[in-house]
């Protein structure tokens, strides 16, 4: 609790409903701590301005809701509304707690971007890419290390052969901490340790 009150521990709050998010922010103000992100924020669009005013991110699915009572009232434009709140100062994150969805998180972001654009929000790809890069890094408190391409950061990078939001684009290269771990044109590229696949590299080659 001391770490929370002193700001050393970032609060990641699981919360579906808009009024519950507002209540949690009131409690945070009362006890002088900060909520960093609301996760599974189905109704974030209802309190998007409040979230933006308080510098709070909302981690949302692109198009999944209705699976239980408190997850009923979402809209397709949820991420776009959060992103564009208060003149575009909102912090939207597209996430997935599914082992399947996480493999195509770029396409999940593309779906949310398309929904926002259909509603007239004019979400640019350069904005939507932040939903799965710099905004999550901000929420985790590691934006000084990852999330964008800047000198001094860890150089985690994917190079695509086309639009990263397209279902037709394929990965050409993957760098982690500046190290080339995948090269489509070079099958001999050393693979990272993956215990599920039984790939175990020597200690000096591990990340």
Per-range role (PLM):
Residues 1-39, 170, 176, 202-206:
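Polyanionic/metal-chelating signatures
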Residues 10, 49-52, 56-160, 169, ...:
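His/Asp/Glu-enriched, well-ordered alpha-helical/loop segment
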Residues 13-17, 39-43, 69-76:
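A general structural motif
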Residues 18-22, 41-48, 101-103:
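Active-site environment of divalent metal-dependent phosphoester hydrolases
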Residues 21-28, 47-52, 109:
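Distinct, well-ordered alpha-helical segments
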Residues 164:
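Small/polar (Gly/Ser/Thr/Ala-rich) solvent-exposed segments
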Residues 167-168, 184:
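Short active-site-adjacent structural elements
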Residues 176-207:
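Extracellular/periplasmic ectodomains of large secreted or surface enzymes and adhesion receptors
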């Amino acid at each position: 609790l001391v770490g929370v009150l002193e700001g050393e521990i970032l609060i990641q709050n699981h919360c579906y409903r808009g009024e519950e998010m507002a209540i949690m922010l009131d409690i945070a103000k009362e006890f002088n701590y900060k909520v960093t992100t609301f996760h599974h924020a189905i109704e974030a669009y209802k309190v998007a301005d409040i979230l933006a005013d308080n510098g709070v991110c909302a981690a949302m699915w692109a198009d999944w809701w209705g699976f239980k009572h408190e997850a009923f009232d979402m809209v397709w434009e949820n991420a776009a509304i959060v992103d564009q709140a208060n003149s575009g100062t909102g912090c939207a994150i597209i996430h997935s707690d599914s082992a399947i969805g996480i493999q195509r998180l770029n396409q999940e972001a593309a779906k949310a971007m398309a929904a926002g654009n259909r509603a007239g929000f004019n979400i640019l790809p350069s904005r939507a890419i932040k939903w799965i890069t710099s905004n999550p890094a901000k929420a985790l408190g590691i934006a000084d290390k990852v999330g964008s391409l800047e000198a001094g950061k860890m150089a985690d990078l994917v190079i695509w052969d086309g639009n990263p939001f397209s279902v037709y684009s394929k990965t050409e290269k993957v760098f982690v901490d500046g190290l080339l771990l995948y090269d489509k044109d070079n099958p001999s590229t050393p693979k990272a340790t993956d215990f599920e696949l039984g790939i175990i590299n020597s200690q000096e080659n591990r990340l």
